[in-house]
């Protein structure tokens, strides 16, 4: 039976989509999760997918907060993710500092959009317990929310959001890059390791065709992104540094054994 791989349809998924075209559903099928990492984690937990390519911070915080449904099994993107801070076209907010004590839009509980709001608060010196959130499911709901005033802002990947900004549906007021490599691979703890081992280009035309971005945006993004040479290793520092920031932001609490985050039958900690 082919592996079910959950993913978010963004430009970061281009290598996966290119491989899927070549594979033709022989060894894996793709399951799109438009709401992001929160939805990917939910589907892993509910046995709706076997593997997820998802954001580093929610995957790590999920395990740190007690999830036994999945383990980390590989690296996907080795560079940080640049999270844009976005508000409505006519909203009164013009900088990140204007957002203090306002409601921030997120896609789901435990999503990257929520985790990065905590990181933003940490950088701004705001108490994490003062943050208020409103769930808006996906980028379309988030944009609607900042324009109708029910939220002040939301956070989403810069280049994914740029077409909406170019169309004057919303505005950038800042950005917060992740202080860690941005994407990891996780698998259900019941997924056979051999399947993952066996089934484990920066192509402007491919991204143009599949995502409709202008060539200048694609070239700008390609200068900022890196993919690992070996997906079957994860640097111990990625997990410890991420946990350190998440602890300071109040997302996770306690001390952790790094080996409990990974499936060592599949991936090697280095």
Language-model features: locations:
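Extracytoplasmic/secreted proteins, especially bacterial periplasmic and envelope-associated proteins
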Residues: 39, 43, 112-119, 141, ...
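Short, glycine-/small- and polar/acidic-enriched structural segments
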Residues: 2-127, 133-134, 152-158, 169-179
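Periplasmic-binding protein-like
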Residues: 77-87, 166-191, 259-270
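Pocket-lining segment of extracytoplasmic ligand-binding domains
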Residues: 138-209
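Short, low-complexity disordered leader/linker segments with a strong preference
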Residues: 1-2, 270
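Secondary-structure end/capping motifs
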Residues: 193-251
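Helix N-cap/coil-helix junction residues
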Residues: 67, 126-128, 212-213, 251-252
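C-terminal solvent-exposed extensions
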Residues: 242-270
């Amino acid at each position: 039976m082919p592996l079910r791989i959950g993913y978010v349809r963004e430009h970061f998924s281009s290598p996966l989509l290119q491989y899927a075209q070549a594979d033709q559903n022989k060894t894996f099928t793709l399951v799109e999760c438009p709401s992001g990492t929160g939805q990917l984690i939910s589907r892993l937990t509910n046995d709706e997918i076997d593997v997820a390519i998802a954001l580093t911070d929610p995957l790590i915080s999920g395990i740190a907060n007690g999830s036994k449904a999945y383990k980390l099994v590989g690296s996907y993107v080795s560079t940080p993710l640049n999270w844009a801070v976005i508000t409505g076209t006519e909203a009164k907010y013009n900088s990140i500092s204007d957002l203090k004590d306002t409601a921030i839009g997120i896609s789901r509980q435990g999503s990257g959009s929520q985790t990065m709001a905590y990181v933003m608060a940490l950088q701004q010196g705001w108490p994490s317990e003062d943050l208020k959130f409103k769930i808006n499911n996906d980028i379309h709901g988030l944009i609607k929310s900042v324009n109708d005033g029910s939220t002040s802002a939301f956070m989403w990947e810069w280049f994914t959001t740029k077409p909406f900004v170019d169309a004057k549906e919303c505005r950038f007021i800042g950005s917060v890059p992740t202080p860690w490599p941005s994407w990891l691979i996780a698998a259900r703890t019941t997924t056979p390791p051999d399947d993952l081992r066996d089934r484990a280009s920066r192509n402007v035309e491919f991204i143009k065709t599949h995502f409709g971005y202008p060539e200048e945006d694609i070239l700008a993004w390609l200068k900022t992104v890196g993919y690992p040479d070996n997906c079957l290793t994860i640097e111990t520092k990625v997990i410890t540094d991420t946990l350190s920031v998440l602890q300071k932001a109040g997302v996770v609490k306690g001390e952790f054994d790094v080996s409990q985050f990974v499936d060592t039958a599949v991936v090697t900690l280095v």
